[in-house]
Amino acid sequence: MEVTVTRLYALIYDYVDDDVLERRAPHRELHIRMVRERLADGRLIMAGALGDDPPHGGLLVFADAGEAEEFAEADPYVTSGLVRAWRVDPWQTVS
């Protein structure tokens, strides 16, 4: 059986606290626009919230670590202080 290993990069956000839904509202439109632009051009593979309401974080999967870091540094969720911590972790998928 042949196995294909693909290296991707997970950008993981830890949100600040339980009122994140209210606090993110003014920044959500730009955040979603940034996500959609990168999904459309292939730089971003998938993205979504982690946890139930309210979410406790986010997960964005990129093909390039540099793209993940650049996204986080420009993301209004990060620059406005909604994200307590973020990191980019290598993720090896097997298919």
Question: Which positions does each model-derived feature cover?
Answer:
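Conserved, structured core segments of small domains
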Residues: 1-95
